[in-house]
Amino acid sequence: MEVYKKINNNVALARDAKGRELVVFGKGIGFASMPYELTDLSRIQRTFYDVNEKYLALLRDVPEAVFLAADDIADTAREELDCTLNANLTYALADHLNFAIQRSREGLNVQVPLAYDIQHLYPHEYAIAKQGLHELCRTLAVDLPDTEIVSIAMHIITAENEVGDMHSTILTAKVISELSAI
């Protein structure tokens, strides 16, 4: 694997054996002078393919721990919802969570008017978001308000809809059906 661009000491851009671009995470991955051939692939902790260009700058601005927590939430959503999610969910979540942590430190609290609706119309996404937020707060020793559960859930819902999978279509039809019954 050729590592060719440093993002920071632990994150870099690379090309795999097939020439596909990816982002690699690992202790000291970006420390060596670029470019170089990475032969010990066990040094890689995580890889990300199909990264949108606009999200690459986030890798410099968002702390690695926040990024990895966002990726854990995205992984849980992929596993538990058993559907394809937009490949950039991790980046969108990392950006949001980093900003939420900054707002929290400044004492700013944002209200989310759709909280009740999201919780009841998307219970699986809400549960994943709730679990993810509590794990993030525990791991990073931060205190974020429960309103962030809804924001995280909305990112997951958006990631479902951006790929246009059958799960989203069925869910939308179900919601419309329930609303029609009222």
Role assignments for model-derived ranges:
Residues 1-182:
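A cross-family "folded-core" feature that marks the main globular domain of proteins
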